[in-house]
Structures are given as C-alpha cells and as structure tokens.
C-alpha cells in the first residue's frame, strides 16, 4: 500500500511499531528511525546510492534489523503543493520498495533540508559534518512530521 494519507497509514499500522523515514536524493538516501510509540524520530545513516538493488538491500537490512513496520518517504513538492520532477523519483522508490510488504506513506518534505541545515549550523556542526549528515537529519524531520500526524497531533 502506498498512500499520501496519514489516516490511511495509521489504519494500516493499527498495532503501531517502528517506522523508517527516507529522504531520497540522486546521490544519497538519508535514513531515520522512530520509536514504536511514534514519539521521536532520530537521524540514522546515509546510504550512498549505487544501483537500486544494492540500495534496496541496505534498506531491507535496516528494516529487518530494526523490526520496522512501515516506511515514510519524503515527497518533494513545489511551493504551491504541486508535484515537482523529483516527486517521480520518490514515487518510483515507493513502488520499488512496495514488495517489502510494508505500508508506505509519501510525506511532504518541503523545507526539511533547509531546516536540518539551520539546526546543524546552530549546533555548530562543521561544514564537513553537515555535508555528511544532512540527508539523515532531513529524513528525521520528514519522519517526525509524519509520526506527529500519525499520532494525531497534526493533520
């Protein structure tokens, strides 16, 4: 199941469980994870993209290791809410991960990378550390927005 509705995702995850958040780019995939109660999203690793089969294998390994019950993928939208050319890449990622058998939520990722960078600057991350971790921190912001909606605190 692939959806853009937090309500549909929440229904599919009636028993809760840990979620994985993905910020997909052309060169990297930022990964974040949340707790089983959908309270806190934390930045995880960054996957350097190679071939999709290898990327998927890394995601599958994280899903299995962490007992993930659902996937949240950042959906790049234009400022007016319309889909951008990059949106198709996120949708393709969702279709390719669908055979993992987990519900997938496409979540608006507007401004997450900029917000992650500002937060990292405020925390005095060096430029090199920001470049290394920006995608996983953006994934955490995407996932946090989604779990806030899933938990009912934002619709």
From Swiss-Prot:
<dbReference type="Pfam" id="PF03652">
    <property type="entry name" value="RuvX"/>
</dbReference>
<keyword id="KW-0540">Nuclease</keyword>
<protein>
    <recommendedName>
        <fullName>Putative pre-16S rRNA nuclease</fullName>
        <ecNumber>3.1.-.-</ecNumber>
    </recommendedName>
</protein>
<comment type="function">
    <text>Could be a nuclease involved in processing of the 5'-end of pre-16S rRNA.</text>
</comment>
<comment type="similarity">
    <text>Belongs to the YqgF nuclease family.</text>
</comment>
<dbReference type="InterPro" id="IPR006641">
    <property type="entry name" value="YqgF/RNaseH-like_dom"/>
</dbReference>
<dbReference type="GO" id="GO:0000967">
    <property type="term" value="P:rRNA 5'-end processing"/>
</dbReference>
<dbReference type="GO" id="GO:0004518">
    <property type="term" value="F:nuclease activity"/>
</dbReference>
<dbReference type="InterPro" id="IPR012337">
    <property type="entry name" value="RNaseH-like_sf"/>
</dbReference>
<keyword id="KW-0690">Ribosome biogenesis</keyword>
<keyword id="KW-0378">Hydrolase</keyword>
<dbReference type="InterPro" id="IPR037027">
    <property type="entry name" value="YqgF/RNaseH-like_dom_sf"/>
</dbReference>
<keyword id="KW-0963">Cytoplasm</keyword>
<dbReference type="GO" id="GO:0005829">
    <property type="term" value="C:cytosol"/>
</dbReference>
<dbReference type="InterPro" id="IPR005227">
    <property type="entry name" value="YqgF"/>
</dbReference>
């Amino acid at each position: 199941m692939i959806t853009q509705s937090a309500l549909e995702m929440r229904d599919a995850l009636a028993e809760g469980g840990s979620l994985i958040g993905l910020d997909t780019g052309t060169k990297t995939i930022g990964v974040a994870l949340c707790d089983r109660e959908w309270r806190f999203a934390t930045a995880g690793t960054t996957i350097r993209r190679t071939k999709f089969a290898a990327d998927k294998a890394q995601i599958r390994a994280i899903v299995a290791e962490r007992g993930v019950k659902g996937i949240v993928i950042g959906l790049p939208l234009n400022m007016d809410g319309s889909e951008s050319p990059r949106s198709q890449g996120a949708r393709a990622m969702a279709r390719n991960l669908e055979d993992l058998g987990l519900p997938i939520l496409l979540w608006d990722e507007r401004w997450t990378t900029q917000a992650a960078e500002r937060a990292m600057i405020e925390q005095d991350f060096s430029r090199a550390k920001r470049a290394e971790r920006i995608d996983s921190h953006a994934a955490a912001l995407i996932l946090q927005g989604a779990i806030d909606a899933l938990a009912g605190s934002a619709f």
